[in-house]
From Swiss-Prot:
Annotated PANTHER family: 60S RIBOSOMAL PROTEIN L4 (PTHR19431)
Protein keywords: Ribonucleoprotein, Ribosomal protein, RNA-binding, rRNA-binding
GO biological process: translation
Protein name: Large ribosomal subunit protein uL4
Organism annotation: Pyrococcus abyssi (strain GE5 / Orsay)
Pfam family for this entry, one: Ribosomal_L4
Record function comment: One of the primary rRNA binding proteins, this protein initially binds near the 5'-end of the 23S rRNA. It is important during the early stages of 50S assembly. It makes multiple contacts with different domains of the 23S rRNA in the assembled 50S subunit and ribosome.
Similarity annotation: Belongs to the universal ribosomal protein uL4 family.
GO CC terms, sorted: ribonucleoprotein complex; ribosome
Single GO MF annotation: rRNA binding
Coiled-coil ranges per UniProt: none
Length: 255
C-alpha cells in the first residue's frame, strides 16, 4: 500500500510504500502491559535502616509490676522502647530493597506491543478516540520529507505544523495544561501536561530544538522509539508525524 509524502508546505510531493508493521493487529492488552513494564523499571528500590528503632538500651522488667511486659528504657522515665507500637520503635514490616517491584514482559510480547502501537498511529478511529484533533490532518500516517529534521527554530516549526494540520492538536495540549491537585504540586510535579503530536525522525539534525518548546510535542529518533512514546498512559493512537528516513528505518527493523 502506497501513501503520500508531504513537503514542509503541506503539499503532496511523492509516494512511499507503507511498511508491513503498519498492518499489525491492534493489541491494546499487550500495549498496556508493555507500558506498565516500562514504568515499573524506573521505580527506585527503597528500604529502611535495619537498625532503625533498635538503638536503645532496654530491658524486660518481667511480670509482677502491674505494667505491660515490654522492653523498656533502663533509665527513667521507663518508657516502652524498641517494640513497634512504642515511640521511636522499629517498624513492623518495613519496605525492603529485595522486594520485586517491576513487572516483566516477554521480549516477543514487547516487540509485538511496539508494532501494534505503531500500527495504531495510522488508524483514524483510534487516534480520534484518544482525543487528538485531526480534522485538518491530510492523512494517517502523516509522512513528511526529511527536510523537517533540519528545522531548528521554533517559529519555523510553528508555521510548518500549521501547514501540516497538526497545530490544532498542539493548541489542545496547551489549553489542557493546568496545576495538579494534591501535594504533587509541591514535589516537582506542579503542572499536568497533555500529550500532543509525536515527531519520529531518522536522525536528529536540529528538529529537537525546533519542536521542544511546543506544548505536548515530543521528538524521538526511530531507533529509540518505545511503546511509551506511542501510547502515553497506556492509551494507544498518538498523533504521529513520520519522516521518510524514519519509515525506511522501520522497514529495516520490523519489515
Amino acid at each position: 500500500m502506497k501513501v503520500k509524502v508531504f513537503d514542509l508546505n503541506g503539499q503532496p510531493v511523492d509516494e512511499i510504500e507503507l511498511p508491513k508493521v503498519f498492518f499489525t493487529p491492534f493489541r491494546p492488552d499487550l500495549i498496556r502491559r508493555a507500558v506498565i513494564a516500562s514504568w515499573t523499571h524506573r521505580i527506585q528500590p527503597q528500604g529502611r535502616d535495619p537498625m532503625a528503632g533498635k538503638r536503645r538500651v532496654t530491658e524486660n522488667i518481667g511480670k509482677g509490676h502491674g505494667m505491660a511486659r515490654v522492653e523498656r528504657l533502663k533509665t527513667p522515665p521507663r518508657y516502652a522502647a524498641f517494640v513497634p507500637f512504642a515511640r521511636g520503635g522499629r517498624r513492623t514490616h518495613p519496605p525492603k530493597v529485595e522486594k520485586i517491584i517491576w513487572e516483566g514482559i516477554n521480549k516477543k510480547e514487547r516487540r509485538l506491543a511496539i508494532m501494534s502501537a505503531i500500527a495504531a498511529t495510522a488508524n483514524y478511529d483510534i487516534v480520534k478516540a484518544r482525543g487528538h484533533i485531526i480534522d485538518n490532518v491530510p492523512q494517517l500516517p502523516l509522512i513528511v520529507v526529511d527536510d523537517l529534521q533540519k528545522v531548528s527554530k521554533t517559529r519555523e516549526t510553528r508555521e510548518i505544523f500549521k501547514k501540516l494540520g497538526i497545530w490544532d492538536d498542539i493548541e489542545r495540549a496547551k489549553e489542557k495544561t493546568g496545576i495538579r491537585a494534591g501535594k504533587g504540586k509541591m514535589r516537582g510535579r506542579r503542572y499536568k501536561k497533555a500529550k500532543g503530536p509525536l515527531i519520529v525522525v531518522g536522525k536528529n539534525e536540529g528538529i529537537v530544538f525546533g519542536a521542544r518548546n511546543h506544548p505536548g510535542v515530543d521528538v524521538v529518533v526511530v531507533d529509540n522509539l518505545g511503546v511509551e512514546h506511542l501510547a502515553p498512559g497506556t492509551h494507544p493512537g498518538r498523533l504521529t508525524v513520520w519522516t521518510v528516513s524514519a519509515i525506511e528505518r522501520l522497514k529495516e527493523i520490523y519489515g
